[in-house]
Swiss-Prot record:
Coiled-coil residue windows: none
Pfam families per UniProt: SPOUT_MTase
Function: Specifically methylates the pseudouridine at position 1915 (m3Psi1915) in 23S rRNA.
Keyword Lipoprotein: no
Recorded catalytic activity of this chain's protein: pseudouridine(1915) in 23S rRNA + S-adenosyl-L-methionine = N(3)-methylpseudouridine(1915) in 23S rRNA + S-adenosyl-L-homocysteine + H(+)
Chief location: cytoplasm
Description of how the protein assembles with itself and partners: Homodimer.
GO molecular function, one term: rRNA (pseudouridine-N3-)-methyltransferase activity
Location of this chain's protein in the cell: Cytoplasm
Name of the protein: Ribosomal RNA large subunit methyltransferase H
Amino acid sequence: MRIGLFAVGRLKAGPEKDLAARYLDRFAKAGPAVGLELARLVEINESRAANAQTRKREEAAQLEKTLADGSLLLLLDERGKALDSESFATLLGTFRDGGKRDLMIAIGGADGLDPALHARADAVLCLGKMTWPHQLVRILIAEQLYRAVTILAGHPYHRA
């Protein structure tokens, strides 16, 4: 299964971008052994619309343009379901084994994600109940993707 990462906001050069890239590179190298591959990273600028509802709608339209037909959609949202790393790995394995070719993981902007995306999403997860800046969310999900691959492969990286 091809996994894409969609992010509202761009990472500037620096340690956050380097660390996210390091984990995505590890995921890209280890993933094919368990049937997962990094398809692409899509970054968009935050909308400059006057109100939050319009900003979310504009950002959602950009996301919709990137989705392949029949693609699964996983949203990262502070009101989503919290999973431990093993459960996240299991979810990815279930998605992979379900016959869909593409999964897009979406990181929203400062205003969150449009309700229409929530209605269309196959899963809505959180990385804990705290609010995180998108730079850290990018690092956290990149690391969890790599960790999920190691769990699915039985690699000792994950020691729970």
